[in-house]
Amino acid sequence: VIRDVRGFAVKFYTEEGVFDLVGNNIPIFFIQDAMKFPDVIHAAKPEPNREIPQAATAHDTFWDFVVNNTETAHMVLWVLSDRGIPRSYRMMEGFGVHTFRLVNEQGKARFVKFHWKPLLGVHSLVWEEAQQLAGKDPDYHRRDLWNAIEAGYFPEYELGVQILEEEHEFAFDFDILDPTKFWPEELIPVQKIGKLTLNRNVDNFFAETEQVAFHVANVVPGIDFTNDPLLQGRLFSYLDTQLIRLGGPNFHEIPINRSVSPVVNNQRDGFHRMTINRGVTSYSVNSLQDNDPRPSTKKEGGYVHYAEKVDGRKIRERSPSFHDHFSQATFFWNSMSDIEKQHIINAFHFEVGNVESKEIRERVVEVFNQVDNQLAIAIAAGIGVDPPMIPGGTGVKGQSPAVSQMNTKHSTLSRKVAILAENGVNEDEITQVINRLKNFGVTTEIISTSLGTIKSTTGHEFKVDKTFSTGESVMYDAIYLPGGKKSVKQLSDDEKALHFIKETYTHAKTIGASNEGVDLIADAQIYGIAIASTESTASPVNSLGVITIRNASNMTSFIQSFSQAIAKHRHWKREVGISSFF
């Protein structure tokens, strides 16, 4: 749950062999040239003299790399945005990052970028949540994915492609082969071509997950590569990685990596060989076995590379079209809502605020002043350096609504609600909420002082799922506070319960409360919102995502409003100081 770019890789077992789509949850990368891979990794990892910090980029060497390699500016904004702390693997996009080629049977090629679009929409945590979850449950994302699949809430992603004719390669103000740039969906729409459903968990995590070997060069006929310099390096590096990680050259024969269609080659021996080859030959061309094995021809379904015309000198130098490091960074910044911009600024304050070198902090402001002047001023205000003295920015005015999470899908499906209750809870209220939320695809867990059961006012027993020691507000999407005088009194006297409620509100999540449960809102010191009064009719009141109702026996209208609020994910208008810099 730490802030980072996430991998998003899929292995296709096709009739023509294995195709690995090895991507990330962000459509671009830090660097343009694969030669810089070791450098960016070394800079981001713990500093070698003290092996600190672990799993964090909030330190001097990473930001020293950023200010001296400004091609990173665009990616840094994506990582410091809410995209860097996804709510769930089920709620993040996937991207192939690079530009590939699709080649038809006639040999005609088109440029393509691959996308995975989650059907649940793209949603994120807030930074404080991510920090707490890293300590409370380091396995949060893995557990969330596993539990959702076990419960039958199968994660689904639509596979989409952006396709560009080769003759339009130079039609844009960015180089389409630059891995630090993305293709705006408003210019090149994403066409949906399929759907991925994760409908079961693995049987053995080590055998099927730890041993899986993704390799960018694993493609099938019809898919080919481009001159993206980062892609060219990855074609080698993944093979090199698997040779070491999985103990030798035969990693592709491990069951999870093995092609389901027959694949024949001249590879022999080596550690962990799993195929017993017969015959005297292991080379081509040969006459002893009638040239068997041999590569398949195109007619036989063999792989044939695209016949690309090449003209020019072969040198290690990037095209001048790669030299613009800031225009798309500005474009991304323009595309963010004020809420999202504030979150990026807050992330800068945390990350760069942990940099000890004042010179590097000053240079961060200088670099991002070239992206946007107001952004640079806002960064400077929180890291103890002077704001830029000269106007900055690139002059780019455009934006892409598709990259803002404010324009994503919303759903209640597989959302998780904590119900805070003690002995004396109102049975009818809690039962109606649990049963009807289930119809919306919402799961519920009862949180109480101790494990076991609690009794309602009528003596009905409810199983307690978590206590205030094992269940935290950051593990849920919303909370519900049912009525029942005795239950509410016990919760009101419990500091952990009140903290649970207040923290849920602080993180902009939905809160629902009925009858006496409404009193807990004020007890938790949540002010500035409207709540149902004791004299009000049995109609729900919605104030900034806090749904309250009194004098109600039929909870239908309340549950409807509550579920709609849960689907919105967060209620960002609660956040204060959003207009501080805008």
Residue ranges of model-derived segments:
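Active-site-adjacent core segments of small-molecule enzymes
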Residues: 1-427, 431-439, 443, 448-469, ...
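Catalytic nucleophile loop
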Residues: 357, 448, 478-484, 497-523
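Glycine-rich phosphate/pyrophosphate-binding loop and the adjoining helix
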Residues: 399-406, 475, 540-582
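Acidic, Ser/Thr-rich peripheral helices and adjacent loops at domain boundaries
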Residues: 454-471, 528-542
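Charged helix-capping and loop-helix junction motifs
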Residues: 463, 493-499
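Short glycine-rich, flexible loops that bind phosphorylated cofactors or substrates
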Residues: 487-489
